[in-house]
Design a protein with these regions (language model features):
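N-terminal helix-turn-helix
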Residues: 1-71, 230-238
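An N-terminal domain-start capping segment
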Residues: 1-15, 81-104, 227-240
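A structural signal for short hydrophobic beta-strand segments in well-ordered beta-sheet cores
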Residues: 47-48, 94-95, 195
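Amphipathic alpha-helical effector-binding/dimerization core
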Residues: 53-150
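Short, basic/aromatic recognition patches
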Residues: 76-84, 148-191, 231
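Juxtadomain coupling helices with adjacent low-complexity linkers
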Residues: 164-168, 186, 202-240
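A short, hydrophobic, proline-anchored segment that marks a local hinge/packing element in signaling
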Residues: 191-199
Length: 240
């Protein structure tokens, strides 16, 4: 394992690739061992031999790098979610607008702050979730109508807003706080605030869920949610 890692480090140090003999010298490995390891790495997708005989990192390394960056980013974001959960006694959620979809990224819940039953994916329920409505509220009318034209307003509970005009009117908020009053799941209410970038463009939303009767308390904590959203915004700006 150590020899393979040393060899991969040697390959990674050459942006245009390098021949096996050079890699063997730099990794301090016998040439026969180097060839064996390179063949194994190539078979698994971690190294690629170019037509000129030079070796470069394979596609699976790029995939791992992307996953690693995502994990590191989530590790930096999670303390903010956990702190908000503990402050409000409610499960906290972070979602992002990625590839024109609204995706749930992370949840901080616990025995005293249970998460909502995610029985329908957030990608298909933006109209019924505080998080989804919060992101939609940051779109201009044209972009919002385009999104809704591709995502039917499915009736999830008796409280779900399925009439486009009414939904559009519900997306205005003087405080930036958007609510879901049992529109996604009966017995659960949610509140969300937007997370933007430095230019003010929406990146996602921060949300909390609770019993419907607790929503007034959550509404009064809008400033705490906005402060957490700003903390998340700074983290995204610095590390993504």
């Amino acid at each position: 394992m150590q020899r393979a890692l040393r060899l991969m480090e040697a390959v990674a140090s050459h942006s245009s690739g390098a021949p096996a003999k050079q890699l063997a010298r730099e990794a301090r490995l016998p040439l026969a061992t180097t060839y064996h390891l390179l063949r194994t790495l190539a078979h698994e997708g971690y190294a690629t031999r170019l037509p000129d005989g030079f070796w470069v990192l394979g596609e699976r390394v790029e995939s791992l790098h992307g996953r690693s960056r995502t994990q590191q980013l989530l590790a930096r974001l999670r303390p903010a979610l956990v702190a908000l959960r503990d402050e409000l006694g409610a499960a906290a959620y972070f979602g992002m607008h990625v590839d024109d979809e609204i995706r749930l990224i992370d949840i901080a819940d616990g025995p005293r702050a249970p998460r909502v039953d995610l029985w329908v994916g957030f990608e298909d329920a933006a109209h019924a979730t505080a998080m989804g409505k919060c992101v939609l509220s940051q779109f201009d009318d044209e972009r919002r109508r385009d999104y809704l034209s591709r995502h039917p307003l499915v009736d999830l509970t008796p409280h779900t807003i399925t009439e486009p005009g009414r939904l559009m009117r519900s997306l205005s908020s003087s405080t930036g706080l958007l609510l879901d009053r049992e529109e996604y799941a009966l017995g659960t209410g949610c509140a969300a605030v937007p997370v933007t970038d430095a230019t003010g463009s929406v990146r996602g939303a921060l949300a909390v869920s609770c019993r419907p009767g607790k929503l007034p308390k959550i509404e009064r904590a809008a400033s705490q949610m906005r402060a957490t959203a700003e903390r998340i915004q700074r983290t995204l700006t610095l590390h993504s």
